[in-house]
Amino acid sequence: MIPVVYSNLCPVCGGDLESKEIEKHVCFRKKRSLCLFPEDFLLKEFVEFFRKCVGEPRAIQKMWAKRILRKESFAATAPTGVGKTSFGLAMSLFLALKGKRCYVIFPTSLLVIQAAETIRKYAEKAGVGTENLIGYYHGRIPKREKENFMQNLRNFKIVITTTQFLSKHYRELGHFDFIFVDDVDAILKASKNVDKLLHLLGFHYDLKTKSWVGEARGCLMVSTATAKKGKKAELFRQLLNFDIGSSRITVRNVEDVAVNDESISTLSSILEKLGTGGIIYARTGEEAEEIYESLKNKFRIGIVTATKKGDYEKFVEGEIDHLIGTAHYYGTLVRGLDLPERIRFAVFVGCPSFRVTIEDIDSLSPQMVKLLAYLYRNVDEIERLLPAVERHIDEVREILKKVMGKERPQAKDVVVREGEVIFPDLRTYIQGSGRTSRLFAGGLTKGASFLLEDDSELLSAFIERAKLYDIEFKSIDEVDFEKLSRELDESRDRYRRRQEFDLIKPALFIVESPTKARQISRFFGKPSVKVLDGAVVYEIPMQKYVLMVTASIGHVVDLITNRGFHGVLVNGRFVPVYASIKRCRDCGYQFTEDRESCPKCGSENVDNSRSRIEALRKLAHDAEFVIVGTDPDTEGEKIAWDLKNLLSGCGAVKRAEFHEVTRRAILEALESLRDVDENLVKAQVVRRIEDRWIGFVLSQKLWERFNNRNLSAGRAQTPVLGWIIDRFQESRERRKIAIVRDFDLVLEHDEEEFDLTIKLVEEREELRTPLPPYTTETMLSDANRILKFSVKQTMQIAQELFENGLITYHRTDSTRVSDVGQRIAKEYLGDDFVGREWGESGAHECIRPTRPLTRDDVQRLIQEGVLVVEGLRWEHFALYDLIFRRFMASQCRPFKVVVKKYSIEFDGKTAEEERIVRAEGRAYELYRAVWVKNELPTGTFRVKAEVKSVPKVLPFTQSEIIQMMKERGIGRPSTYATIVDRLFMRNYVVEKYGRMIPTKLGIDVFRFLVRRYAKFVSEDRTRDLESRMDAIERGELDYLKALEDLYAEIKSID
């Protein structure tokens, strides 16, 4: 491995953590494992106990055990069949034998009886007696046993009761060290039960302060919820550092079929071909009754309505084959069924949807009015009110009443008709069809869902919206019913056998930012949340993993300043020394020295990444498998490498690479895990060391010369500063121009009135290929030129768009368009699509939208709650719009232009002007890549002109300087913005009227550096260094040789 030292980051002794220790997973000073936690000794004992009682524990059960043994409360996120109940009972018995009190709560008496029998069997297998150890209570036990139970209640080490007993007798129960709740929904139905659980754990409610006080004596383990949690459940997060989450998992393996026919004959045909296990969803209760009456004589079928629920049990027992109900989001058949063996397929008779009519306008919620405003934003009156729509709700209502009968907004995923708008209800469809495909310990059962709809316009809109959820419908003609039925049965056979022992394993998934962590967790359901030492962790079950998603908050270490040669031990091996990053929360200063207060402002309000490293270690130790999903570049690779080293001994560490934050991309990345690429890491190590060495050495020279410790020098920023200075000097030279406004002409002339002769020399039509999609430098240039954003602002906005899943990764020099990108473009462009790959194939891709959604679509779908994003402002939508238009234009047919070339004669001079006078085509409409001007009249004219003295050349804009950096090979996509921002930050340049002007300080610093250290900061040397970095990335150059050359060069600076 790459030699490295992490200063004071050994988890065992607190001293340095070195390469050999990382490789061996051992602290050499203490001779102990790097990932040994206090609970591990008890864990070993518990695992042996569990083997005796139950059998070999699953990986996820070991993770739960570690949490409980260190007294952490949590919601157990896991699919059916993993063994939550058996674990809860075995852990209770284990802790009871250690003298701890445990309470196990079930929703029904039957489950209490079963649990009591099971735990006795466990005790028997473990060879321990249960007399006076276990007490259980339910409504069916004789009165004398009940009395005996109540008398000995506080003496039992394990108490097993129903939720109802908790409600009535919690004061007699006493305190507990471990509470296991088998069905948290039963607890949450009565909110006071939450208070009672907290009391049992050692908290109490202070009437004076009106708040909960105390500390948890024990820990709580609950299942995830299926119903609404209610406000009381928030107390779990406040007091026990976890949030329950939902067991509604959106991982699905469903074959979705759309049929433009909702006749009874079509429905009957599906039921006949697929056999038993169908759920039929009707729009309304009346329609459900009609379907039932039509089918009851032909099929063994039942119906579930608000008043008829008896057929549900018959279906469970197999006495009937199919159930009919209504497609309502909170309905019994949509949310209340969890029968993986029985339910094989679903049929929706009619698309789930909700309608808004003109008559509804006055009664609509402000949120719904706002949503309709975004849908009808093409109406000028509404567009004008959108920026402050909340303050004009009543006015918008009146406008909507006028336009809903006339206007037809362009939205493929919504049906707009005269006087009504129909929104497809995908949420209900996903929940209902999800009953056919359930996650269990052995994987995911397969299901099928048929969507029958007569209204072709509504069906088309439904299919369009489904794409936003990665649901692709096929037609019924494409379905092989025999094969489908066999696959449905085979997956249920696997469920019944449950042969795969440990198919679903816990995994820690680390990304850079909290936004990205939240976004990823939302793709797969409503996560349970755990707060561990300040780190927020989102827990979600998937087909192969129970993922714990959390953020590293960028780099966790940086080069130290006070050891070796500016943070590098030079002993022939060049070993970088890294320390945790400290950041002052008050002034923002970042440092690596081991100190409690900020060296700049003295504040003790300092964030130390050490706490995150420790939390990640604990999580990695729990999961025993780590996936690092940091950004797909050298910086992301370096973060992954550091985490792999710092989490040494806690489990295998793999890298997930994805270029967009979408559900599809995350799933693909998790299927294609790889090792950390050390060549990319070496390149980053060399780049950072080079930046440190040249920066520190030359900065110290500047400090001495200018007596200003705020100054800095860098190899890349210095030539860029030189270009800005040179261009500024050139801009001082002036020239006279005559502006003829009537003809939109600018001529090199100094007369205010003169004769002008214009001749048409040539006229031609051309087909122009659209510009390629954005790379980092072209995006930065256009955002500065068109939107007037600084490069720093653009990169920040692009980062947030990427993390929210709206665009692909924004640090790239590739124009390549992937197959996915081309599919997105084809879907949006239709017949205008031609498709271009642009760049060479490879890992990186251009900057593009992740869905075929315009800016207006994105804003509307955010309002509707279909897209869940955070903190977007008008700037985000403006940049997204630019990226979207440029990308879609790049995939269009060539556009046609008409070019006219003119000869212009005036006062004995001749000038030529070629101008585009017309442009047409979809590509031009999307992105105006050419400047269209009016045709010039031909003939001789007496004209008046405005004479101005202007610079021969103008100072650079940020847009132009970025393009120049790209052309001259200075900087990389990840550093363009940093280089420019640093020039502003050091006050070497300022911006006036959008142009970069060097300050006197900037000019003096540049001249000093060029005069004394030209060879170190020259453009050629900087470009050569960039090419060497690229060679290291490709594995063509030894990074130690590069460091050796750099070191010799730096040491020659006097």
UniProtKB/Swiss-Prot annotation:
Helicase ATP-binding domain span: 65-245
Biological role: Modifies the topological state of DNA by introducing positive supercoils in an ATP-dependent process, increasing the linking number in steps of +1. Very efficient supercoiling occurs on relaxed DNA with a single-stranded bubble; the minimal bubble is 20 nucleotides (nt) and up to 10 positive supercoils can be introduced into a 3.1 kb plasmid with a 50 nt bubble. Positively supercoils DNA with all (d)NTPS, although it requires about 10-fold more of non-(d)ATP. In the absence of ATP (or at low levels of enzyme), or in the presence of ADP, relaxes negative supercoils. In vitro protects DNA against degradation at 90 degrees Celsius, reducing dsDNA breakage about 8-fold; ATP hydrolysis is not necessary, while ADP decreases the protection somewhat. Coats all forms of dsDNA; the DNA is protected against cleavage and transcription. Recognizes nicked DNA and forms a coat at the nicking site, which may help hold DNA in a structure amenable to repair.
InterPro entries listed in its UniProt record: DEAD/DEAH_box_helicase_dom (IPR011545), Helicase_ATP-bd (IPR014001), P-loop_NTPase (IPR027417), Reverse_gyrase (IPR005736), Topo_IA_2 (IPR003601), Topo_IA_cen (IPR013497), Topo_IA_cen_sub1 (IPR013824), Topo_IA_cen_sub3 (IPR013826)
Catalytic activity: ATP + H2O = ADP + phosphate + H(+)
Binding site for ATP: Q61, K84, T85, S86
GO biological process, one term: DNA topological change
PANTHER family per the UniProt record, alphabetical: REVERSE GYRASE
Gene: rgy
UniProt note: domains: Introduction of positive supercoils requires the cooperation of both domains. The helicase-like domain probably does not directly unwind DNA, but more likely acts by driving ATP-dependent conformational changes within the whole enzyme. A beta hairpin in the 'latch' region of the N-terminal domain plays a regulatory role in the enzyme, repressing topoisomerase activity in the absence of ATP and preventing the enzyme from acting as an ATP-independent relaxing enzyme; it also helps to coordinate nucleotide hydrolysis by the ATPase domain with the supercoiling activity of the topoisomerase domain.
Name of protein: Reverse gyrase
